[in-house]
């Protein structure tokens, strides 16, 4: 059975970028939390990043083990499809199915759909 994870292109690109930036944003938030008194930036921007991280973490926590591992390979380790196939043994079908599923679920969690 084919899963239907179709979403508008612009939403897909936005969510995919957020997922690709997840690791860097997580490090940034940890840096700010460790030295919150010295933070002199835009607190609204920090709150928005925290909200986006929460949406992504909620979706990642809801995934089964196989999809979670695939999502980490794709979005956190940032392997290409061929790189994931060679290094991690992730098939092309599993790669794209996991990527589309995670993007769709994060978009729904962010109320973009």
Cite the ranges covered by each PLM segment.
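A short pre-motif secondary-structure segment
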Residues: 70-71
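Helix-turn-helix DNA-binding module
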Residues: 77-94
């Amino acid at each position: 059975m084919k899963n239907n994870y179709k979403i508008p292109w612009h939403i897909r690109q936005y969510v995919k970028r957020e997922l690709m930036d997840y690791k860097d944003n997580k490090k940034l938030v940890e840096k700010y939390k460790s030295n919150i008194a010295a933070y002199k930036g835009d607190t609204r921007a920090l709150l928005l990043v925290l909200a986006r991280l929460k949406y992504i973490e909620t979706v990642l926590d809801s995934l089964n083990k196989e999809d979670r591992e695939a999502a980490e390979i794709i979005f956190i380790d940032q392997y290409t499809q061929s790189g994931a196939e060679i290094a991690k043994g992730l098939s092309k079908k599993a790669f794209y199915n996991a990527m589309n599923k995670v993007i769709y679920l994060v978009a729904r969690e962010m109320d973009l759909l």
